[in-house]
């Protein structure tokens, strides 16, 4: 029996021309912004109203070539009738696994344009299936100490002015970039992990001693990213 073929993912975040990442899949996540109910004396629901349809899309990308990824949280892209603002970026790399980038956002007012934006630092990515130090957030040293996973998460906070569930204005602020890593120790000495300039080890290295396994160290480095108002 013939099928309809594979689905075509939707490019919500304007990365179609990127030479570094390529769209793999997307999710729309459509829902109502307002869901209200009224109850009787017993607390049973007797009325319901819904308003303000929004989408909270996300998209997964493969890393198709080496290079720097440049992202601007708060940037806006129009898809059909939906105006989508980019709010989040998550990158996962690990030993013997393909690196993945996930972008996420929310729809805003019809005909909306970018308000404040947050420019993330350049993120160097390799298509190799290995753990990668992301955004140059830290340095690692130590004989027999190997990075086995590294992830990056950056998310901007969106605030809205609304009327009857519909957004009439929005703004973006409050972004932190968090890079987390796991290091496996096979030598006698613990790894040396230091935050790069502009970064801070907000979760110091902490070890786990598994049964029938090597010592593993986990940590997090964080950097604040300021928002810029439109001119």
Enumerate the predicted regions with their spans:
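Signature of extracytoplasmic/envelope-associated structural regions
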Residues: 1-231
């Amino acid at each position: 029996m013939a099928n309809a073929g594979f689905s075509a993912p939707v490019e919500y975040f304007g990365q179609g021309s990127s030479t570094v990442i390529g769209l793999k899949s997307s999710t729309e996540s459509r829902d109502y912004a307002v869901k209200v109910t009224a109850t009787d004396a017993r607390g049973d629901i007797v009325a319901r109203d819904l308003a303000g349809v929004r989408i909270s899309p996300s998209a997964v990308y493969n890393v198709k070539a080496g290079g720097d990824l440049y992202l601007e949280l708060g940037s806006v892209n129009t898809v059909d009738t939906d105006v989508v603002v980019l709010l989040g970026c998550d990158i996962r790399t690990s030993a013997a696994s393909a690196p993945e980038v996930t972008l996420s956002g929310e729809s805003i007012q019809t005909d909306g344009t970018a308000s404040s934006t947050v420019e993330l630092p350049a993120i160097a990515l390799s298509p190799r299936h290995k753990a990668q130090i992301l955004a140059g957030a830290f340095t690692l040293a130590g004989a027999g100490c190997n990075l086995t996973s590294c992830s990056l998460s950056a998310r901007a906070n969106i605030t809205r002015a609304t009327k009857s569930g519909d957004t009439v204005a929005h703004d973006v602020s409050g972004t932190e970039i968090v890079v987390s890593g796991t290091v496996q120790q096979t030598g006698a000495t613990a790894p040396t992990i230091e935050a790069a300039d502009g970064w801070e080890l907000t979760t110091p290295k902490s070890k786990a001693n598994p049964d029938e396994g090597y010592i593993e160290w986990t940590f997090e480095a964080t950097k604040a990213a300021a928002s810029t108002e439109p001119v």
